[in-house]
Curated annotation (Swiss-Prot):
It comes from Xylella fastidiosa (strain M12). The active site is at residue 70. Keywords: Cytoplasm, Fatty acid biosynthesis, Fatty acid metabolism, Isomerase, Lipid biosynthesis, Lipid metabolism, Lyase. Its EC number is 4.2.1.59, 5.3.3.14. One of its GO terms (biological process) is unsaturated fatty acid biosynthetic process. The keyword Lyase applies. It comes from the Bacteria. One of its GO terms (cellular component) is cytoplasm. The gene is fabA. This is 3-hydroxydecanoyl-[acyl-carrier-protein] dehydratase. SUPFAM superfamilies: Thioesterase/thiol ester dehydrase-isomerase (SSF54637). It holds the Pfam family FabA. Pathway: Lipid metabolism; fatty acid biosynthesis.
């Protein structure tokens, strides 16, 4: 199966509407919760574990919605949004790889470190997600390590991010 290796914002928003992948009902969040503008590379066999990688970018502008409310007079991107982007990308990888139809849900992570912040004068956030394990049974679970860089400086690191793909989320 030939797969695309980069995605535009329009294609990512099509995923939010359930229009991009015919084999799955998994979706990315819609605006404003979609936390990246494009996927610049996604590969099934990359990374130090050979399980796959996905890289994405978010263009930073002073008018992004979160700067107006977090915090008044001290605008900063909430750390949880960067972490959520890492979960979004892990779930996107599972859907892209054809693992299973299902609804993606964040299941946790082993470790998170914040060593910097995203301010309105920044230009670019990059996400680098490296898959470390994929369990494909009744429940598909993806595990990844990820880092977030602002203007080429690493500011977040997450280890053992976990995303599950559920056929039914009512009992979750």
């Amino acid at each position: 199966m030939s797969r695309q290796h980069a995605y535009s914002r329009e294609e990512l928003l099509a995923t939010a509407r359930g229009e991009l992948f015919s084999h799955s009902n998994a979706r990315l969040p819609n605006d404003p919760m979609l936390m990246f503008d494009r996927i610049t590379g996604i590969y099934a066999d990359g990374g130090s574990h050979g399980k796959g990688i996905v890289n994405a970018e978010l263009d930073i502008r002073p008018d992004l919605w979160f700067f107006g409310c977090h915090f008044l007079g001290d605008p900063v991107m909430p750390g949880c949004l960067g972490l959520d982007a890492m979960w979004q990308l892990t779930g996107f990888f599972l859907t892209w790889s054809g693992a299973t139809p299902g609804y993606g849900r964040a299941l946790g992570c082993g470790e998170v470190k914040f060593t910097g912040q995203v301010l309105p004068n920044a230009k670019l956030v990059r996400y680098e997600v490296e898959m470390t394990k994929i369990i494909n049974r009744t429940l598909v679970i993806g595990q990844a390590n990820a880092r977030m860089l602002v203007d080429n400086r690493e500011i977040y690191f997450a280890k053992d991010l976990r995303v599950g793909m559920f056929n039914n989320t009512e009992s979750f």
